[in-house]
UniProtKB/Swiss-Prot annotation:
Name under which the protein is recorded: DNA translocase FtsK 1
Main localization, broad class: membrane
Pfam families recorded: FtsK_4TM (PF13491), FtsK_alpha (PF17854), FtsK_gamma (PF09397), FtsK_SpoIIIE (PF01580)
GO molecular function terms noted in the UniProt entry: ATP binding; DNA binding
Chain segments annotated as transmembrane: 63-83, 116-136, 156-176, 184-204, 210-230
Subcellular compartments: Cell inner membrane
Natural source organism: Neisseria meningitidis serogroup A / serotype 4A (strain DSM 15465 / Z2491)
GO CC entries: plasma membrane
Functional description taken from the UniProt entry: Essential cell division protein that coordinates cell division and chromosome segregation. The N-terminus is involved in assembly of the cell-division machinery. The C-terminus functions as a DNA motor that moves dsDNA in an ATP-dependent manner towards the dif recombination site, which is located within the replication terminus region. Translocation stops specifically at Xer-dif sites, where FtsK interacts with the Xer recombinase, allowing activation of chromosome unlinking by recombination. FtsK orienting polar sequences (KOPS) guide the direction of DNA translocation.
Biased composition (Basic residues): 1-11
Cross-referenced InterPro entries: FtsK/SpoIIIE/SftA, FtsK_4TM, FtsK_alpha, FtsK_dom, Ftsk_gamma, P-loop_NTPase, WH-like_DNA-bd_sf, WH_DNA-bd_sf
GO biological processes: cell division; chromosome segregation
Region called Disordered, residue ranges: 1-36
Amino acid sequence: MTEKSHKKTAKGRAGSPSPTSARNKKADNGARGNKVSERLKAVKELQKTETKKARPEHVVNLIGDALWLMGLAATLYLVISLISFDMGDPSWSHSSPVVEDVANWGGLFGAYVADVGYYLFGWSFWWWIAAACVMLYKNFRLHAKQTENEAYNHKIAAAALFVLTVFSPVLEYFVLGGKYADSLPVGAGGMVGIRVGAVFAWLLGKSGSLLIILVVLLLSLSLLVQISWLEFLNGAGRAVQNRLSALSGKVMALGKRRPNTKTDGVDTQNTRRMVKEAKNITAKPVALPEGSSSNRKSVAVSVAPPPKIQVSLFEDDEPRQAGEYHKPTLNLLRIPDSEPVSINPAELERTAELIESKLAEFGIGVQVVSATSGPVITRYEIEPAQGVKGSQIVALSKDLARSMSLQSVRIVETIAGKNTMGIELPNDKRQDVMLSEILSSPVFAEAKSKLTVALGKDIAGTPVVGDLAKMPHLLVAGMTGSGKSVGVNGMIMSMLFKATPDEVRFIMIDPKMLELSIYDGIPHLLCPVVTDMREAGQALNWCVAEMEKRYRLLSHAGVRNLEGFNQKVEAAKAAGKPLLNPFSLNPDNPEPLEKLPMIVVVIDELADLMMTERKAVEQQIARLAQKARAAGIHMIVATQRPSVDVVTGLIKANIPTRMAFTVQSKIDSRTILDQMGADELLKYGDSLFLQPGSAEPTRLQGAFVSDDEVHHVVAFVKEQAPANYVEGLLTGEAAQETANIVSPNADSDELFDQAVAYVLESKKTSISSLQRQLRIGYNRAANLMEALENAGVVSPSDLNGSRKILAHKDHL
């Protein structure tokens, strides 16, 4: 082998790797690959771990929001369930009839939840609502990052709530006793209060228990809200101190100011003098002095005087005797501010000039001669120019209102005793007319009639009252919101202040069950407030029968009206020779006659009556309106739909006194007043009062009386005497008995034919069987049996009380 071959061989060995080195290199590459793959796996695991850590925070926020909303919804559901709790709903604590409609707003489940809560804890169950609200508020602030390092401890709050729901019912039971038994399952405090309270009272006594319970409740409330009472008191003290400092600074600043007798450039002394003189100025034109810039006469200003009220805030100084009826006092009503209506004569002058200029734009020449301002409107009296017709001015009422930017303008074509016309404009600021102003006025106090009613104030601010005995009936109409119901309430309240139950009695018919039901139970009522229209027909039938009875009594006594009858009865009793009842059920020993009260029938909504019992109601109202005045029976009929099918010609012809509040159309105004104008009123008590024999109505602002005032007066009246109802008035029995007393011929009874048929078919002649069959009272059944005897249907009763049937079907 040569040297070259050795070199090639060595080179070849050196250039080609050996199998062992190749295997080692492959192993190294595999190890490096494993490490890379392990690193990649570690990175992926780390990413997964970070993703898992980040995802729960977002999910937790969503879950927290959902739980917060669910808690809010549950709290609101619990609130409406507790508010609408009704003892008549199905419940867990007591049995109740099966009802289809559950009154609870939360449904059947809400009714059970509210019942269980009130049964266990009484009113203290509302602490659960308070705790839920506190927890929701705290969690909301914490979640919204509005608080730093603040965490609401729910465990402490739960413990505080537990203590509250145990101790609060005990306090409720001790303070309220067994009250609210009608509105709560077991009364105030629930079963927890009753049971735990008994243990506390036995161990610590009532006084000691109250002291400990109050301390525990304060601590529990502090833990529930998680506030410190000391910090709260310190904060309240600082707030009061800051407020006092601010007030003292204002007082010192006011003290440094110089007194100024003039305000805003107006001489207050001169203004007082002008207002004082304006009150005494009559509505007569006053000529302007020569050289005035205007040829128009100056406006004579008539200002509504301030209400002068003299009210006794306490009861009468005389000692009150037991059983004596006392009329309500004015301290039960709200007393208004005795501030006069602010009138600016310059403003009246500007308005008068504006009226003249606006009418001149329409080609109408007028001259304003005077102005009268009242609580709601101001009337400007105008003299039309020569050749101008009043109808031309009346036709421009809407155009004048639009040009003056007013809600409405009412034009009075004729003013009694004057050759002027009236333009009534609404005031910028309304003045409330309270019922107490009218009742405290001399015109009401000096009125002798027991049926004096407060109507309101006229355009000059003068109180206006009416005598229902002279009207003698009143028809009231007005749309919703016009003040009709308030006006009727004011009339009823006026009579309650004026008369006792022995002098005036009421029959109230309230189809809406809202307006007059507040008077239910007063001693002036002859029957409960009528809400069923069928019973309303029976009540009117009784009134007609009572009217006929009274006319018989008046005729027998030889007098012309109820007032004369009562005077004669009183005089005979004073002379020791009382008048005897000529229609007594015991003719051998008749009872003496007593004074008869006047009766006022109040119908709140005539439209409902006419829809249900049209013929009977229309005839009965017409009969009462025609004849009932002398018998002392009067009516106040109200409706919010004065259409011709409700206020018929028969009713209108017999009720000449009308009072119209705001109505919807000119047709309604013509229906109620026989003229237009009620459609242009301003609502809220603005009305037109048409008296008998008067062609032009009087514009009034009705007296306002609130529900609270009515409640106070009704409660006072109920304390004076209990309700005294006429038995059977709403069933028709009282009317029939009254008719039988006046006319003993009971065969006029509408059930006479049915009684004859029943006796002939059943062969039963006892009064009790007739009473059961016809479903009537015993007295009426006895009268029917006597009528059957007089008609020859049955024989007189024998010694055993039985009767024989004398007639047969063939003979009838």
